[in-house]
Design a protein with these regions (language model features):
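Alpha-to-beta junction loops
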Residues: 2-10, 23-25, 99-102, 174-183, ...
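Extracytoplasmic/periplasmic substrate-recognition and gating elements
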Residues: 76-77, 152-155, 192-248
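Hinge/lid segment of periplasmic solute-binding proteins
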Residues: 12-66, 75, 84, 88-92, ...
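Conserved N-terminal structural module of periplasmic/extracytoplasmic solute-binding proteins
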Residues: 1-22, 31-39, 53, 81, ...
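Short helix-initiation/N-cap motifs at beta->coil->alpha
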Residues: 1, 13, 84-90, 159-174
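Glycine-centered hinge/linker elements that transmit conformational signals in sensory
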Residues: 92-96, 131-161
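A ligand-binding cleft/hinge motif common to bilobed small-molecule-binding domains
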Residues: 15-19, 182-197
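Short, solvent-exposed loop/beta-turn-alpha elements that line the ligand-binding surface or hinge
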Residues: 28-41, 122-143, 193-194, 206-212
Length: 248
């Protein structure tokens, strides 16, 4: 107690709190010392590892919202591809609803809501980062989309909150009572193991823009440790984020 570890895996939403408190090591010094190649990191994920110009983390265990769909049910309904637009989503969900099954299921969760907000042209913060970026249509259109689909009986709202709601959503998919679900890309392997049908993966349908809020966690290094510990920590960070380990 009272002593931070050398390294930690941290949810990206918490990164700024510790960086603002000057608790994190700027990893750029290690990158510069050995001319470490950073090109293998996806730019969009790497951007979320910087705070006020300092490289305070490396991407690890990152994910984005995706649309999973039951390929068998799609074939039975005469559908060939995952829906691309919100209109496609509504039409496909209607075609897939019936016999005790909903066409679509999604937790009423802020992360999945924000994915629809961004696909409607909104952002979490405005350009000056002193207010929200989803006032007006980008913020309300996703809610009206959900409201319409729930009223039409084509959208299942899983019970519970947070992770419980997501688990209920995945159970509905695996059990055949939801043909499409919006979940994290991190759930792919688990769904492939539990579902007795072929699982398809598509982008979250868009309204005006194809854009998503990346989630997951980063690896970081805390200040307050010896030079030897920092160097050992850097070696472990490289090991954990190299291509071979990242794709496992």
């Amino acid at each position: 107690a009272g002593e931070a570890p050398v390294l930690a895996q941290m949810q990206i939403g918490m990164l700024g709190i510790f960086a603002d408190a000057d608790q994190l090591v700027d990893l750029q010094k290690f990158v510069d010392e050995e001319n470490y190649d950073m090109s293998d990191f996806m730019p969009g994920l790497l951007d979320a590892s910087y705070y006020d110009g300092a490289l305070v983390a490396l991407p690890h265990s990152r994910s984005v919202p995706v649309l999973y769909y039951n390929k068998d049910r799609f074939k039975e309904a005469g559908l060939e591809e995952a829906p691309v637009t919100w209109d496609d989503l509504k039409a496909d969900a209607k075609a897939l609803t019936g016999n005790g099954s909903y066409g679509y299921s999604c937790p009423l969760d802020q992360w999945y809501y924000m994915s629809l907000v961004m696909n409607a042209g909104g952002t979490i913060f405005n350009e000056t980062e002193d207010g929200i970026g989803f006032a007006g249509d980008p913020g309300t259109k996703p809610l009206y989309l959900w409201k319409e689909m729930i009223a039409d009986g084509t959208m299942h709202v899983p019970s519970g909150q947070d992770y419980n709601s997501s688990e209920a959503c995945r159970n509905a998919f695996a059990g055949g009572t939801a043909a499409m679900i919006q979940q994290s890309s991190a759930q792919l392997k688990g769904l492939e193991k539990t579902c007795e049908f072929e699982v398809g993966v598509g982008a979250v349908p868009q309204d005006t823009t194809l854009s998503y809020p990346a989630g997951g966690s980063n690896l970081l290094m805390f200040k307050g440790h010896s030079e030897e510990e920092e160097k050992a920590g850097w070696e472990f960070l490289k090991y954990m984020t190299n291509t071979e380990n990242a794709v496992r």
